[in-house]
Amino acid sequence: MADIHIEEFYKDAAIALVQLYSAFPRRINLFVEDIAGPDEPDEFGLHSKRHMACFGALLWLEEEGLLRYVDTIRQEALDQAVLTQKAFVRLSTPASAGLRAQLEALAPRVQDQLPESIRQDLSTHIHLIRNALRSGSSATISQVMQGAFFGGTCALTSDH
């Protein structure tokens, strides 16, 4: 994917959703620096483009009905954020067979010997997102997020 800002969006959204899922149903403060890394405002008090892009991604997740929050803490965090029912259900459900097959082709797993209940848990969108984040591959993160929230998958090539 040539658009770095889109890759960063997918990664920011993935990290935020994993943090919220891990705390669900508790409300948490979702800090931009915990997602995008440290940022020092410039001499005018303005944050970097990267910081603001991450903050924008968090606001977009709310606008699209994937999270709720009580207020913003300046442009640094969302106060009392929690997943919506829509996001919780989506993250908890198994991914499509097509998406799982594409990911398994990249990194074959030995899941056939596992009990069905464990295989189902390992096939959920949240598990695939966590694995994609652990891989560090922007292409894999993008593919998993597209499959989980945008209903499509793209052919995965190599990461840059």
Task: Give the location of each predicted region.
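Short amphipathic alpha-helical interface segments
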Residues: 2-46, 52
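Short acidic, glycine/proline-enriched loop segments that cap or flank alpha-helices
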Residues: 4, 46-49, 71-79, 98
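Generic structural signal for hydrophobic core residues of well-folded globular domains
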Residues: 20-24, 61, 90-94
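A short, conserved structural fragment
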Residues: 59-75
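Short, amphipathic alpha-helical interaction segments positioned at domain boundaries
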Residues: 79-113
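Membrane-inserting effector segments that mediate pore formation, membrane fusion
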Residues: 107-160
